[in-house]
Amino acid sequence: MALHTKDDKFAHLLAMYCEFDDWARAHDVKVFLDWGTLLGAVRHRGFIPWDFDLDISATWGDYQRLLKAWDEDPLPNRAIVNIYRNPGYPSLFSRLVDTTTTEIRRASAWDLAPCGMSIDIFPLVPLPKDPKERERAKDAMLVFYELTNHMMLNKRSRRKSMRRLLAKSLVKRRIFGEKRVLEDLHRIAFSTPEEECTAYMELTGGSVDACVIEKDVLGTYKELPFEGHMSYVPEKYIEFLQAGYGVTWRNYPSNRSGGYHYVENLDIPYDVYVHDYMQFLDKEKVLKNYRTFKAKELQDVLMRAHVSPEYCRTSLQPARLRVEAFGSPSEYAEGVPEDLEAALTDYVNAQIASKPWYWRVWGGLSDEWIALACRIFFDRGMYNKIMHIITQRSWSLDEPLPESILEVKNKIEAIFRVYNAIDYDDTDEVRRLVAQDGAVLDALVSTHADLYLHSCDAEGEDDWRAVAEAAETALAAFPGDDEIERRQAVAYAHIGRTDEASAMLEDIIVRSNNGMTVLAAKDDRKELGLDERN
């Protein structure tokens, strides 16, 4: 197959998306950017350079209208594929496929459906308001996914209630057949009227809690540019990103070389692969093996559920004992030695690792020690780690969080409410939050908020000179802070120190790990006319 570059693929996906978005709008359907594509729109105004795909979503009502409109008026050389239209297809969500191209995926390239260059379309299913009914619906949806997908095992969480329903459903399937079991699960999972719901569950590859979306976060949608195409995004798109990626979504990941496992061709239709190559493959045998192995994997999950959680719990004990050997957490109110910090870090890293997360296992370290770890991580700015350990603690123990942990959690939430308001460029909200939460905000976020407000209020040269002086003072307390230096550079540009401003902004663009700061610095250079100077 002919080679193509990532830029070729991005250009192809963008053309597909623009065509489909225009079609959707013409048919009174709203699809919005999601996952890495939404993150790219907000942080890069386009594709994330190290990403590989394009993701969009639709609420349940829009999704149903989309499928109906497609049946009546499809786009040429395109197909929408999912388990309902293509029996045996392994995904609950849909894909928009370009049938003039080829994209061979491990599980779906068996002539089950057209398999070309594609865009994921994730439907958002309404969830019940009642907490118990909501959990029941989420479990039913996960088990429904497991029993309709005969190719891949869900690698996400295995909480007890979901395992119980899976075991019960497998027994019922042997007795009553698959059709009845799936109908029962479908009724539980998909029966909540959208007008009555306050949250959705997003149908991705079988995910659980991380994909619950509050209805008010979606709101009435906004539009942001994605590679120049104005696109729908959730009204509270920053909170949406926080729910999916954590509070540090603004930062670039340390590993930007994500794996890629597809074979693609932009010029050869998938039919050519089916007719010319699949004749050498035993399709029926492979699909039969998939079903056999999937059934064994489900039984294996249920068998391991009696052993693996306890094994995880046991494996956490050495890290727990190393922490507890330091005595009582109350002894370290005035300071924590490095070896205790290291022991707490090791325990938390082990606790939030994939296997304890998968089985919802808690290693037993007391809340007092967890509170101490949270305070240490807070001082280091490791906010995602704190939120992960708090989430794991909440999932695993049916007990309310103590005040000592809630205090740290509330501080983090207060900090990021301010940063969210700054990124929304909502000066009134920033002022309100600073007045409301000033007592719990740390010095750095207070400094960022003050410089933001002073910059928004600045009009003449004297105002900008005051901003520059405030930034210089702040840098004495927080040397090398990218956001403070950016505010300083903008102030310098307004008081005639343009060469310094240009160099500072260029340096921030090159070195900063905060994508929103980089984006703002690029905008600053353009708005201040500094790009034209170089």
Language-model segments: residues:
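Active-site nucleotide-donor binding segment shared across nucleotidyl transfer reactions
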Residues: D21-L54, A58, Y63-Q64, D216
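Start-of-helix register in tetratricopeptide repeats
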Residues: E368, I412, S446-D450, E483, ...
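Conserved catalytic core of two-metal-ion nucleotidyltransferases
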Residues: A2-H27, L67-R134, D139-Y245, R250-E297
